[in-house]
Amino acid sequence: MINVNCLNNIAACGLKLFSDEYNTESSFEDAQAVLVRSAKMHDMELSDNLLAIARAGAGVNNIPLDKCAEEGIVVFNTPGANANAVKEQVIAAMLLASRDLIGGNKWVADNAEDPDIAKATEKAKKAFAGQEIKGKKLGVIGLGAIGQLVANAAIALGMEVYGYDPYVSVKAAWNLSSEVKYISDVKDIYKECNYITVHVPALDSTKGCLLYTSPSPRDTERSR
């Protein structure tokens, strides 16, 4: 029997994929394998039994990689597993940044009992008009599994998309819309774009890749 510990909630449909030789209800101390999502493992004591850690997601910054390397513990990640969900969050964030949907919803709730709600709405609605994202410029930093989906979705919404990724793979490039404009200097993203979305791993090599300008574009950061 191989003992597996789940540090975070893992969907039942995923756990059903294990065969009968796996015990997915093991304690952390007895586990030979660990499944983790967002739990921070850097201060956790790793047992001598532990052979592997699998992250349900792309980033591994919550796992002590150096310690695992020293102790021979193999670390896996699952890039792209939640890519579509993150893409939808990014698109939603851009819409929220462009049109004050939350503020508008609060205004309706606060004024729902106003007997002159029709007149009040006509007077107040301009404050929540916002702007369309069609025709606006989106900069995508990181063109991996998530970044390419965001770029393609933004193209479909009529945006002008600029992409930056010095390590873009051939597969990712093939999956990108031909309308995405490739940028070789990340600074040009900040010069050109109304919106910027960042999808890069948290590594020493990516520290300092974000620039803050004034006036700043609308940023949405969905990195690990």
Located regions from the model:
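Phosphate-binding beta-alpha-beta segment of Rossmann-like dinucleotide-binding domains, i.e.
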Residues: 79-137
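Short gly/ser/thr-rich secondary-structure transition/capping motifs
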Residues: 17-22, 34-37, 115-124, 175-183, ...
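Hydrophobic/small residue at the entry helix of a nucleotide-binding pocket
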Residues: 146
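An N-terminal-biased, well-structured beta-alpha scaffold segment characteristic
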Residues: 1-78, 191, 198, 211
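Rossmann-like adenosine-cofactor binding region
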Residues: 39-45, 166-214, 218
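Aromatic pocket-lining residues of Rossmann-like dinucleotide-binding sites
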Residues: 154
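Conserved beta-strand positions in the Rossmann-like core of class I SAM-dependent methyltransferases
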Residues: 162
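Glycine-rich Rossmann-fold phosphate-binding loop(s) that bind the pyrophosphate
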Residues: 143
